[in-house]
C-alpha cells in the first residue's frame, strides 16, 4: 500500500492522539475511583472524570474515521483506465439497451457503498468533535479541581504551626520565652511538635496519601486533556487535507480514464469528438452571436429612432423619449377646433422670466430646448404641435 506525505502525517498524528486518548482514559478512571473514595468527610470532594469520557470519545471517533478512510476509501476512486467498479462512475444504461443479467445486477448492487462510507465518515467526525469538546471542558474543570485539592491538602494534612514559632528562630531558644527563663526549659518544649505531627499522621495519613495521589492524577488529566485538544484539531485538519487530496486524485484518474475511452483505439491519436459536444459548441456560438450588444430602445443616440417621432407627434415622442427632455414651462396651443390645449411640458404655470420662444435661453438652459415634436414647421407657424 503506497502512502503519500499527507497520509503519513495524518496516520502519525492519529496514532499519537490515540495513545494520548487511551492514557487519558486510564488516568481519568483512576481519578474517578480516588475521587469517589474522597467524597465523604473530611474533604468532601467530587469525582472528576473528564479525561475518562474524552478519551473514550476520541478513541471511538478515531476508530470510526480510520474505518471510513481505510476500509471504504479505495472503492470510491477507481484507477484510471480500469473498468468501472461498484462505486462512483457507473454509467447509466442507454434507452435501447437490453436488461442486465443477474451477474451484472449483482455488480451494480454495490452502489450504496460510497453512501455508507460517507455516513460512517460523518459519524466519526461527529464523535471525534464531541471528544475534543469534552477534552477542552475536562482540562478547564480538572485545572480548577487541582487548586481546590491543594487548598484541602494544606488545610487538613499539613500540621498546624505553633503560634510563636518562626522559621528564622534559633533551634535552642523560642521567641516567646522570657529573658530570664531557664535554659533547660527549651529542650523540654521541643518534643511537643513531633508528638502533634505523629498524632496528625496517625489520624489522616491514609486519606492524605489518597488526596495527594488524586492531585497528581488531576494534573496528569489536565495535561492529557490539553494534548487531546491540540492533537485532535491537528489530526482533523490533516485528515481533511488527506481526504480532499484523495478526492482530487480520484477525479483526475476518472478524467484520464474518460479521455482514454473517448480516444479511438486504432486512429491517428486525435480525440474523437462526439456529436453532443459539437452541438453544444454550436449552441454556444449561436448564443454568443445572439448576445451581441444591441442599441437600446430608450437610447437618445440611436440613429434608427430619428424618424420615430414626426413633427407634431408629441405622443410618439413622449413614448420613446420619456426622460430625455425637461420642459419647465407650459406650451399653450390651439387645436383644429380652436380650443386651447397643453402640448407636453410641465403641468405648472409658466415660470416668470421664461419665454418658450426666446432663442437666447436655449444656450443657457439646454434642457429647456424644445423637442423635435414641438418645433413648428416652417409653413405652419400658427401651430406649436
From Swiss-Prot:
Q: Which UniProt keywords apply?
A: Membrane, Transmembrane, Transmembrane helix
Q: What is this protein called?
A: Transmembrane protein 271
- What residues form the membrane-spanning segments? 9-29, 50-70, 121-141, 219-239
Compositional bias of type Basic residues: which residue ranges? 246-258, 278-292
Stated membrane topology is:
Multi-pass membrane protein
Q: Where is this region: Disordered?
A: 83-111, 160-203, 245-305
Asked if the keyword Signal belongs to this entry, the reply reads no
**What species is given as this protein's source?**
Homo sapiens (Human)
Low complexity bias: where? 163-197, 259-277
Location relative to the cell: Membrane
Chief localisation class: membrane
Give Gene Ontology CC terms: membrane
Amino acid at each position: 500500500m503506497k502512502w503519500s506525505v499527507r497520509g503519513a502525517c495524518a496516520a502519525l498524528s492519529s496514532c499519537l492522539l490515540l495513545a494520548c486518548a487511551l492514557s487519558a482514559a486510564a488516568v481519568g478512571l483512576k481519578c474517578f475511583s480516588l475521587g469517589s473514595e474522597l467524597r465523604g468527610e473530611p474533604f468532601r470532594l467530587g469525582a472528576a472524570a473528564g479525561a475518562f469520557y474524552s478519551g473514550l470519545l476520541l478513541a471511538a471517533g478515531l476508530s470510526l474515521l480510520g474505518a471510513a478512510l481505510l476500509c471504504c476509501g479505495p472503492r470510491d476512486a477507481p484507477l484510471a483506465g480500469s473498468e468501472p467498479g461498484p462505486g462512483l462512475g457507473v454509467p447509466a444504461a442507454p434507452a435501447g439497451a437490453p436488461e442486465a443479467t443477474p451477474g451484472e445486477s449483482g455488480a451494480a448492487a454495490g452502489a450504496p457503498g460510497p453512501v455508507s462510507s460517507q455516513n460512517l465518515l460523518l459519524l466519526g467526525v461527529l464523535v471525534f468533535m464531541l471528544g475534543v469538546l469534552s477534552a477542552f471542558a475536562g482540562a478547564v474543570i480538572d485545572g480548577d479541581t487541582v487548586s481546590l485539592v491543594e487548598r484541602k491538602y494544606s488545610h487538613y494534612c499539613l500540621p498546624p504551626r505553633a503560634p510563636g514559632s518562626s522559621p528564622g528562630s534559633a533551634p535552642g531558644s523560642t521567641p516567646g520565652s522570657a529573658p530570664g527563663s531557664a535554659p533547660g526549659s527549651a529542650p523540654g518544649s521541643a518534643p511537643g511538635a513531633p508528638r502533634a505531627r505523629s498524632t496528625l499522621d496517625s489520624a489522616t495519613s491514609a486519606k492524605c496519601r489518597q488526596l495527594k495521589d488524586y492531585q497528581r492524577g488531576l494534573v496528569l488529566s489536565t495535561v492529557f486533556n490539553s494534548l487531546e485538544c491540540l492533537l485532535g484539531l491537528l489530526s482533523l485538519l490533516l485528515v481533511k487535507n488527506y481526504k480532499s487530496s484523495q478526492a482530487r486524485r480520484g477525479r483526475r484518474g476518472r478524467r484520464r480514464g474518460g479521455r482514454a475511452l473517448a480516444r479511438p483505439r486504432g486512429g491517428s491519436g486525435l480525440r474523437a469528438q462526439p456529436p453532443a459536444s459539437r452541438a453544444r459548441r454550436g449552441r454556444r456560438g449561436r448564443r454568443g452571436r445572439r448576445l451581441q450588444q444591441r442599441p437600446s430602445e430608450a437610447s437618445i443616440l440611436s440613429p434608427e429612432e430619428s424618424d420615430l417621432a414626426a413633427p407634431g407627434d408629441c405622443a410618439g415622442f413622449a413614448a420613446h423619449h420619456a426622460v430625455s427632455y425637461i420642459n419647465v414651462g407650459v406650451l399653450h396651443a390651439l387645436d383644429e377646433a380652436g380650443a386651447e390645449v397643453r402640448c407636453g411640458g410641465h403641468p405648472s404655470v409658466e415660470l416668470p422670466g421664461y419665454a418658450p420662444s426666446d432663442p437666447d435661453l436655449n444656450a443657457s438652459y439646454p434642457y429647456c430646448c424644445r423637442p423635435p415634436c414641438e418645433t413648428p414647421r416652417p409653413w405652419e407657424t400658427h401651430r406649436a404641435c
